[in-house]
Amino acid sequence: MADLLPTILTAFATTMATKGAEAPANTFNEAWKYVFGSLDSFLLRKNEKRKYDNEKYIESLTEKVEQIPVENIQEPKMSILGPALEASKFYIEEEDIREIFASLLAASFDSSKSSLLHHSFVEIIKQLSPLDARNLKFIAQRKRCPVAKYLLEFETGGQSLLKPLIFIPHDGEIESSLDNSMFDFDRNASSITNLERLGLIKVDFTTWLSKKRKIHIT
């Protein structure tokens, strides 16, 4: 592992050094070696994809740490750093989840974020799927997003609920392929339900973003 660490961690260590933060960098390096240890020693030699994913992980973390003002750099709490690294090693290949872990790790180095960090965040991230992560990012960027229900109302009276929750994370030009995940109503509904269960979003069917109306299909 020792011969692989310099390649993977040099950029991060260099960034921290320019901020006069050798101690936090050393803490991270030692934590990485302790957590990933023999697992990566084997996988990095046998799997080029694993090496690539690790490098992208550190690259993302480095970019985020570079944005932290020098005066805000702090020694990360091991109670955040350790569990986050431990959990993330099983999600390295999932880019969307990996990005969230990188953001959490970067925040642990930022004193201005200390009051916002909570130890439960690691467990919450572990319960996210890649689709959950993409949908959460989509919603966070827009603050409010529309959801809908599909109901059939019969002329004779009565209703039939076709879809209890419809969420389409669409922005820009609609893609022609109906295989795109944005049109997978059931998966997106399950994703939104999970995000609400975790307390990350709130689904509200009582507030309308536009005028309430019914669409009649003949």
Map each language-model feature to its residues.
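Charged, alpha-helical interface segments at or near domain boundaries
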Residues: L5, L9-L131, F138
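Generic preference for hydrophobic/aromatic residues in regular secondary structure cores
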Residues: I8-L9, A13-M16, C145-F154, I201
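Arginine residue identity/basic-tract feature
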Residues: R45, R50, R98, R134, ...
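Short amphipathic alpha-helical interface segments
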Residues: L116-N180
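Short amphipathic alpha-helical interaction segments
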Residues: L178-S210
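Short, amphipathic alpha-helical interaction segments positioned at domain boundaries
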Residues: K211-T218
